[in-house]
């Protein structure tokens, strides 16, 4: 009644009951139709599943968030807590062990910029050429530029947006 409609019931013993609900509605115009945006791509693909990411992050909470996002993409995550450990891990492991490094900038012992420069100087060119993405609280345009100048391939500002992390990682893994 509130919608100026009616309900009609028609019943035939032994055959069943038919309910009819009538509600007067206006047809939506083309401009009124809300088009739902579908994601451009799925983040978990056979191509990405099992790829290994080296996460250099000293903050446990930030590491936990990053690990959750990356593992949700089907990626395998190894974590180190500073730049010294990151460079050492890259030196110790065979080339191709990792597909990408997600690097914090402000870490103890060696910051992300110095770690990136040390990795870029490794003798093994495959190791030296690994994609490195900055994941940092340094969110200004000058910080983004500095990350690229120091040899990084991408920049993600904290607090992280999961969709941006996924898109940046996928782009770097191509």
Predicted feature locations:
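C-terminal compact regulatory domains
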Residues: 1-174
């Amino acid at each position: 009644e509130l919608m100026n409609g009616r309900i009609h019931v028609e019943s035939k013993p032994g055959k069943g009951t038919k309910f009819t609900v009538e509600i007067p509605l206006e047809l939506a115009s083309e401009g009124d139709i809300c088009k739902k945006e579908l994601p451009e791509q799925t983040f978990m693909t056979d191509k990405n599943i099992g790829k290994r990411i080296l996460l250099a992050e000293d903050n446990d909470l930030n590491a936990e968030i990053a690990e959750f996002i990356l593992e949700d993409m089907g990626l395998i995550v190894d974590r180190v807590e500073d730049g010294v450990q990151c460079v050492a891990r890259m030196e110790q492991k065979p080339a191709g062990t990792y597909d990408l490094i997600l690097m914090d900038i402000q870490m103890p012992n060696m910051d992300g910029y110095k770690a990136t420069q040390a990795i870029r100087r490794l003798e093994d060119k495959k190791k030296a050429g690994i994609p490195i993405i900055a994941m940092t609280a340094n969110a200004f345009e000058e910080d983004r530029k500095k990350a690229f100048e120091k040899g990084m391939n991408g920049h993600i500002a904290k607090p992280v947006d999961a969709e941006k992390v996924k898109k940046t990682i996928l782009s770097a893994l191509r």
